[in-house]
């Protein structure tokens, strides 16, 4: 027997069976085992990928139980695990001819077809098994869901996951798979409908409440998300993921102290993780406690040294703390790894603005727009930099470019009007503002937020007053 053998069975009696088999395989003794014992021991060897021992065990098992269906299925599993798909299918097809109405044989054949890439045939076999087996169908539902997912038939895959939950609402794995499927497909409204109905029927199911909260979170319905996560926590007080989700919703609502409390509770339950330390860092950053934020970003990076968001957060904290050169070095290192991250380029632009590296600022903004050309906020920031540097023509050009690229005719046009007006281009300014007002008149106050002195300009006040009177 191998000295470094890693026991699979926890039960002493089962471990003793395995020890006896090891002696038998070493040809030092002969023992008789029941079919179920052979099945368990062969599956153990397959699970730990000791295929040579599995083959030897199968030889002995065949000698002791020559017509056993279970031993034949084990042999098929060995062929599948060693990529001998045709041999596996041949064995199972022979069994199918002998017992055509056996659901286990149909499931085994479906698995063999699935492993060999024959998805449609796998689906048919699993459906055959379903017709033959009317109880304990959850695993077949799951297999059907997987096969339809392979084919890209998301609605069918979702349907079969839902079937699992009809018969087994406590199946946390099925709930997780369904939640992830809704997320991947962007079906957040459908997720809310399903999990609302599910939690009405299963009000004490923590996972159902959690996934409902996650669906609300994706829809940016943060208050309902918090309520759902709180119900999940009532069902299971140490549900770390629910505390995390609640913290995320609170953070998005700007309730930073409460969010921090939720994240810290999750940290106490789950222990350190890069994402938890990052979220805690975010809370402190929004509270302008940059030393503490930096501490947690560094904690996050100790666990995962290339965590993108934490690297950017670290550079930003260094900037806010006045360590501009360190901030620049930090963001430059980040950009070596993540050159396509628009936020990283925007942080660099801000740092370079502060230290007066004008050529680097332009380059950073242009790179940010290359990474995310749909961000109208970046066009606003870039134009603000150019305008404050006295380059009003370039600032207007950037905004016009942004309007064409993003289709945002309100925020960008309001700002373009300000630049034009302050540059003496009154007619052009009014044209920009007319476009913006026709698109979204409610945003007109941002003109005066950016340039408060315009409150004292009678022509501007008259223009906006006349437009309001026409509405």
Functional labels for PLM-detected ranges:
Residues 36, 70, 104, 138-139, ...:
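Start-of-helix register in tetratricopeptide repeats
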Residues 61, 94-95, 128-130, 163-164, ...:
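Canonical positions in the second alpha-helix
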Residues 64-65, 97-99, 132-133, 167, ...:
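Structural marker of alpha-solenoid helical repeat scaffolds
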Residues 74, 108, 143, 177, ...:
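Canonical tetratricopeptide repeat
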């Amino acid at each position: 027997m191998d000295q470094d053998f890693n026991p699979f069975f926890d039960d002493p009696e089962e471990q003793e069976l395995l020890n006896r088999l090891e002696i038998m395989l070493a040809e030092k003794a002969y023992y008789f085992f029941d079919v179920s014992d052979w099945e368990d021991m062969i599956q153990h060897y397959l699970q730990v990928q000791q295929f040579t021992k599995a083959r030897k065990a199968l030889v002995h098992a065949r000698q002791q139980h020559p017509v056993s269906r279970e031993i034949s299925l084990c042999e098929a599993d060995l062929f599948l695990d060693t990529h001998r798909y045709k041999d596996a299918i041949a064995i199972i097809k022979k069994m199918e001819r002998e017992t055509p109405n056996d659901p286990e044989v149909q499931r085994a054949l479906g698995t063999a077809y699935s492993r060999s890439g024959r998805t449609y045939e796998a689906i048919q076999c699993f459906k055959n098994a379903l017709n033959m087996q009317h109880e304990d169908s959850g695993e077949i539902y799951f297999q059907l869901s997987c096969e339809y997912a392979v084919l890209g038939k998301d609605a069918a895959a979702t349907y079969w996951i839902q079937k699992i939950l009809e018969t087994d609402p406590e199946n946390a794995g099925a709930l997780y798979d369904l939640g992830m499927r809704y997320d991947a497909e962007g079906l957040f409204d459908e997720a809310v409908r399903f999990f609302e109905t599910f939690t009405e029927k299963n009000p004490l199911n923590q996972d159902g409440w959690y996934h409902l909260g996650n669906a609300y979170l994706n829809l940016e319905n943060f208050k309902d998300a918090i309520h759902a996560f709180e119900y999940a926590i009532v069902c299971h007080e140490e549900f770390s993921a629910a505390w995390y989700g609640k913290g995320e919703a609170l953070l998005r609502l700007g309730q930073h102290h409460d969010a921090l409390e939720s994240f810290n509770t999750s940290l106490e339950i789950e222990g350190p993780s890069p994402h938890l330390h990052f979220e805690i860092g975010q809370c402190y950053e929004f509270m302008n406690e940059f030393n503490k934020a930096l501490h947690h970003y560094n904690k996050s990076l100790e666990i995962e040294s290339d965590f993108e968001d934490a690297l950017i957060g670290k550079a930003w904290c260094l900037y806010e703390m006045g360590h501009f050169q360190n901030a620049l070095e930090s963001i430059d290192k980040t950009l070596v790894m993540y050159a396509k991250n628009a936020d990283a380029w925007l942080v660099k632009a801000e740092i370079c603005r502060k230290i007066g590296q004008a050529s680097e600022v332009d380059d950073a903004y242009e790179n940010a727009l290359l990474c995310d050309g749909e961000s109208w906020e970046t066009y606003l920031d870039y134009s603000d930099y150019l305008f404050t540097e006295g380059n009003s023509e370039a600032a207007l050009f950037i905004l016009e470019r942004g309007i064409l690229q993003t289709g945002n005719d309100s925020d960008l046009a309001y700002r373009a009007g300000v630049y034009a007006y302050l540059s003496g281009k009154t007619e052009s300014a009014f044209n920009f503002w007319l476009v913006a007002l026709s698109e979204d008149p409610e945003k007109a106050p941002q003109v005066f937020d950016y340039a408060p002195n315009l409150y004292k300009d009678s022509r501007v006040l008259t223009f906006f007053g006349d437009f309001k009177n026409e509405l």
